[in-house]
Curated annotation (Swiss-Prot):
One of its GO terms (biological process) is D-amino acid catabolic process. The lineage of its organism: Archaea, Methanobacteriati, Methanobacteriota, Methanomada group, Methanobacteria. Belongs to the DTD family. SUPFAM superfamilies: DTD-like (SSF69500). This is D-aminoacyl-tRNA deacylase. One of its GO terms (molecular function) is tRNA binding. An aminoacyl-tRNA editing enzyme that deacylates mischarged D-aminoacyl-tRNAs. Also deacylates mischarged glycyl-tRNA(Ala), protecting cells against glycine mischarging by AlaRS. Acts via tRNA-based rather than protein-based catalysis; rejects L-amino acids rather than detecting D-amino acids in the active site. By recycling D-aminoacyl-tRNA to D-amino acids and free tRNA molecules, this enzyme counteracts the toxicity associated with the formation of D-aminoacyl-tRNA entities in vivo and helps enforce protein L-homochirality. It comes from Methanosphaera stadtmanae (strain ATCC 43021 / DSM 3091 / JCM 11832 / MCB-3).
Length: 148
């Protein structure tokens, strides 16, 4: 599983010119799901996301989490994070999870995040326009793969 986490002052996602998700201060998270991922990876990633300390404290040090600042998350499914261009110029997505299973795991991630902070989401399988104001900019990539 792979997360691209961007600290934002605001973000929104549109499908067919309709806003389907919108947040203020928090994270825009691009979520890539690998074909071998399970809820075990998802739980690890959500825990890491909630504890990640990239918001400034009173001394302007990145020391606060999304929960500390009562921030929001906009979660965007993005299978292209597992695009492999090692052998070709056209990406292969063979490492990405199949859509039906990936959608279930994406929804699981959304529900688990929502239990902790206000969470909005993109539309799985749709062509989306994502707008954000990246604050800092701060962008963190988090990856986790368990060896079974």
């Amino acid at each position: 599983m792979k997360l691209v986490v961007q600290r934002v002052t605001s973000a929104k996602v549109e499908v067919n010119n309709n806003i389907v998700g919108k947040i203020g201060k928090g994270y825009l998270v691009l979520l890539g799901i690998k074909k071998t991922d399970t809820k075990k990876e998802a739980d690890y990633m959500i825990n890491k996301l909630m504890k990640l300390r990239v918001f400034e404290d009173e001394e302007n040090k990145m020391n606060l989490s999304i929960q500390d600042i009562d921030g929001e998350i906009l979660l965007i499914p993005q299978f292209t994070l597992y695009g492999d261009v090692t052998h070709n110029n056209r990406p292969s997505f063979s490492n990405a999870m199949k859509p039906t299973d990936a959608k279930k795991l994406f929804e699981y991630c959304c529900n688990e995040c929502e239990k902790k902070v206000h969470t909005q989401k993109g539309e799985f399988g749709a062509f989306m326009d994502v707008n954000l104001v990246n604050n800092g900019p701060v962008t963190i990539i988090i990856e986790k793969e368990y060896n079974s």
